[in-house]
């Protein structure tokens, strides 16, 4: 789809949500995704990655989660055609709503709060769940720090949009 946009000279880039949203170890998928436009037009934005904070996790479980923002930022820094938004989490109450039903279910199992998911002849269903990001939670604090790391480590400020996870 990125190649199609370039071939057709469309005025906007592909807006992409990476796979493995919010899963420890997902930074590898993000790095592979960042390599997609590497041979395309370096003179204009060809790829916009969303909520990259949620796609910059190392480790294999919530117990050993760590930041891999440095690796993500290093990749973005070599690709002038890529723009990301950081998807910064804000401490306190929020609501997530997404068509990524499996991710909403994972959040439900983490927070044990209310959860609603609906699917009508779709590949995935939209879900809604209230979330409380706590300063006292190590995982939530790491999430918060990853967003800041991305903003500080990406050298070109026009390549990292300052966004929050919710509202977005």
Task: Tell me what each language-model feature is.
Residues 1-159:
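Histidine/acidic residue-rich metal-binding segments in metalloenzymes
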Residues 157, 161-168:
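Terminal or standalone catalytic/regulatory effector modules within metabolic enzymes
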């Amino acid at each position: 789809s990125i190649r199609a946009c370039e071939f057709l000279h469309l005025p906007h880039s592909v807006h992409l949500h990476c796979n493995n949203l919010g899963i420890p170890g997902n930074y590898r998928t993000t790095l592979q995704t960042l390599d997609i436009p590497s041979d395309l037009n370096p003179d204009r934005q060809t790829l916009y990655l969303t909520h990259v904070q949620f796609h910059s996790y190392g480790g294999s479980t919530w117990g050993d989660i760590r930041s891999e923002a440095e690796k993500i930022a290093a990749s973005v820094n070599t690709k002038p055609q890529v723009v990301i938004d950081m998807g910064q989490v804000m401490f306190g109450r929020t609501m997530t709503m997404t068509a990524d039903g499996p991710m909403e279910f994972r959040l439900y199992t983490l927070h044990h709060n209310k959860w609603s998911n609906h699917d009508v002849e779709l590949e995935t269903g939209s879900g809604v769940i209230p979330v409380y990001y706590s300063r006292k939670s190590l995982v939530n604090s790491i999430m918060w720090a990853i967003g800041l790391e991305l903003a500080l480590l990406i050298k070109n400020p026009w390549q990292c949009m300052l966004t929050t996870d919710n509202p977005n």
